[in-house]
A protein has these predicted regions:
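Rossmann-like dinucleotide-binding cores of NAD(P)H-dependent redox enzymes
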Residues: 1-42, 151-159
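Short acidic-glycine loop/turn motifs at beta-strand connectors
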Residues: 45, 53, 194-198
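Mid-to-C-terminal Rossmann-like scaffold of FAD/NAD(P)H-dependent oxidoreductases
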Residues: 107-208
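A short, polar/charged loop-to-alpha-helix boundary motif
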Residues: 208-224
């Protein structure tokens, strides 16, 4: 027996949106999972937990997913912008340093012109590799006495396998409104996420091979860019 509690109204609400999140919830419920959503745990006991509404749940094992917090404490006092990570420019150079310094991975908050000029941290599996490559190019240019050039337009991506469902995502779905473009919410489908008429994310449910076509549509001047 498994019970899930979370503050959001639907599971995976931020990366998937309400409709697809509700579909995932129904799929888990069909496999016997119980949900208590819209609230958190207020008290732990030897044999379970108590929720905000007073519900007490018995449990042999409690697993807490606390998320991630940028570890920037050691950088305090350096006049850097440490609001939600380390602020960098598009080429991964840390903003506010007297000498060239780069930051990469989940800690770096940088603008991605594929979407807009707002600096964001991206906690997706492929970004540490992509930002590391870009930072290496930046440092290589600087060490060679040249100014780094070029737009850095990484494509965020994640996947999740749950029971017989395979989720694959490209772009930043959390920034857009979900639109079902193929299939059904409750089954295999492809969902685009639109902002001001522009595709900024896509999620496929058991449609990984079909996503390549939609992936090319994501972001500013997306076709032909990678």
């Amino acid at each position: 027996e498994v019970t899930v509690t979370a503050y959001d109204a639907e599971p995976m609400l931020r990366p998937l949106g309400p409709e697809l999140g509700a579909a995932m919830k129904a799929h888990h419920e069909a496999h016997g999972v119980t949900f208590h959503l819209g609230q958190g745990v207020t008290e732990f006991h030897e044999d379970g937990v108590t929720l905000a509404d007073g519900t007490r749940l018995a449990a042999d094992v409690v697993i807490e997913a606390v998320g991630s917090v940028p570890n920037v404490e050691w950088l305090h006092g350096n006049d850097l912008n440490l609001e939600d990570g380390v602020l960098t420019d598009n080429l991964m150079r840390v903003v506010g340093t007297d000498v060239p310094v780069v930051a990469v991975g989940d800690i770096a908050r940088f603008p991605n012109p594929r979407f807009d000029d707002v600096p964001r941290r991206i906690e997706h599996w492929n970004l540490p590799t992509e930002t590391g490559k870009r930072a290496g190019q930046t440092l290589g240019a600087l060490l060679g006495g040249e100014e780094p050039t070029g737009d850095f337009r990484p494509m965020p991506a994640f996947w999740s396998d749950q029971y017989d469902i395979s989720l694959q995502s490209y772009g930043q779905p959390s920034l857009g409104m979900p639109t079902l473009v193929d299939g059904e919410w409750s089954g295999d489908c492809i969902v685009e996420y639109l902002r001001d008429g522009e595709v900024i994310g896509v999620v496929g449910v058991n449609r990984t091979k079909d996503l390549m076509h939609y992936r090319k549509e994501i972001g500013h001047e997306a076709v032909g860019s990678a």
